Amino acid sequence: MRIACVAETPDYLPAIAQAHLQAFGTLLPEWNFDEALSELRSHTRDGVIPTTWVALDQTQWLGSVSLLENDDARIRQWSPWLASLYVQPQARGQGVGEALVAHCVQAAACLGVPLLYLYCQPALVPFYQQLGWQTHTEFLLGPMQVVVMCIAPGAVTQ
């Protein structure tokens, strides 16, 4: 498995956009495929915010993760964000998610980010805790109960 900037994998962009829309669309009901695809296409460089990375094997994309300045207009008080972690169903349980999270945290550390945030459903908290993330707060985001978590990227990479 290798992890590449999404700009290096243009053939996969429509499939990734569709997967993101299916996985995260309930939180953003006005979001559509064209917006998801446009957002991914705007992530043209590695080592900057925003960017998206894709985990790949020899024949397919396995998952993706983004590093964003702002993730959702309702939670702009925290920034930046690890966002849109998605692993294809057939690749789950194989360390793809962990590798993508570690890659994003490392990139944030290289950019000097003091605290990196994510939000997730409560059932996913143990997954992130085992990777060093801590609970920051909990609240309702639209119809969904979410947990905001944070990590100090520089502390993880030292």
Give, region by region, the residue ranges found by the protein language model.
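Active-site rim helix/loop that mediates acceptor-substrate recognition in acyltransferases
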Residues: 21, 25-54, 62
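Conserved active-site tyrosine of GNAT-family acetyltransferases
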Residues: 128
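A short beta-loop-alpha structural element at the N-terminal edge
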Residues: 1-16
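Conserved acetyl-CoA pyrophosphate-binding loop and the N-cap/start of the following alpha-helix
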Residues: 91, 95-103
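Conserved GNAT acetyl-CoA-binding A-motif
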Residues: 108-120
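Conserved beta-strand in the GNAT
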Residues: 52-54, 60-70, 81, 86
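C-terminal "cap" of GNAT-fold acetyltransferases
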Residues: 119-122, 131-134, 138-158
